[in-house]
Structures are given as structure tokens and as C-alpha cells.
Amino acid sequence: PTRKVTSGCNNANAARNGFGDTLDVYGYNYKPWAYKDFAKDRPHQPFYGAETASCVSSRGEYFFPVDWNKGKGFYLYQVSSYDLYAPGWANRPDVEFAAQEDNPNSAGEYVWTGFDYIGEPTPYNLDATNALNVPEGPEREKLMAELKKLGDRAPSRSSYFGIVDLCGFKKDRFYIYQAHWRPDLKMAHILPHWNWPERKGQVTP
């Protein structure tokens, strides 16, 4: 072969069932909790987060009260921009950051995604192929129940995964990554906007 081979693996068992042996560099999709054991069991093999985060948000949308449950925060085809929300198989950015810092032998991460894109509008996606992201059992049953609940309503057309939206405008999440990846760059990002007359006298996190 003329080049190294890698793969992004959704199935956590791929590292143990022989598939991992076919790869030069092992890629994990949404499995930050697996890094520690992988490094211990396979110290000879480099690894990285091949597809990470999948946090969802709409630029400039803030819903109250703030719900810290990662499966909440969406309403009327928008997702609150506090960057607390993600599908069941995915994570907030700080979860992956912590896993990368705790496992310095990881080669890093590829975030899903840099930009929003047309299609795959999770959490409003009516496409049952979403179920492929989770193993069979209670987690998949929960996902299918959510799809059924959405019913035949017209889905949103665009994804919410991007760090930057379809127009190229930075979401709040952009600054989370900038602060983490560019510690040399002094910055502060305050959200939501501070002149919000409708919320006068209310706590706005």
C-alpha cells in the first residue's frame, strides 16, 4: 500500500472484533468514553475522534427557561443557541474537549460539522437512517419513538450541526472552539445580546 488506512467507526466493538486490526489509524465516531481503554489495550495503534460533537443550534435563538437536558432545547424548527443540545449519540463540545485532554495520546478530533448544510435536519429529521447511529435496544427504540412523534409534519431542510451557519455567520459555538483551540488569542464572547428589553427584570443566563 502507498498510504495509511483509517476509518471512522460507529460501532464500539470494532476495536475488539478484529476490524481495528485492518486499520493503521483507528477513528472513533462519538465515543470519547472509549479513548482511555483503547489506549490501554492497543498502545501500538494511533487513534483519533473521526467524527465528534454533533452539537445542534440555531444562530441567535435563545429559549427560556434554559433546559440542561441535551435532548431538549428545540422549538418551532429552531434549536436554542446555548450549545447544550445534541442527539442521543452525540455530545456537547466540552465532553470531547475533556476526553481529548484526558487522553493526550489521541491525535485530535474532526468536528461534525464546520458548516451547516442542506439536509439531515436533526432533531427535526424524519429520516429513519438516523437509527444507524445508535445500537439496537432502548436507545434506538427511543429514537424511533421520537421520529414517530414528529409524524408527517414537513421537516426542516437544513442541518443544525454547524459551527458556522449556512450564510457563513459564526454561531456562539464558534467561540467555544476558538477559545479552546486558540488559547493564544485573547477574546471574550458574551451571549445572548445584552440589550434585550423584553427580558428586563428577568434572569437571562
Regions found by a protein language model. Give the residues of each.
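Substrate-binding clefts and catalytic carboxylate motifs of secreted carbohydrate-active enzymes
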Residues: 3-8, 18-20, 34-205
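Short beta->alpha connector loops
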Residues: 10-13, 28-34
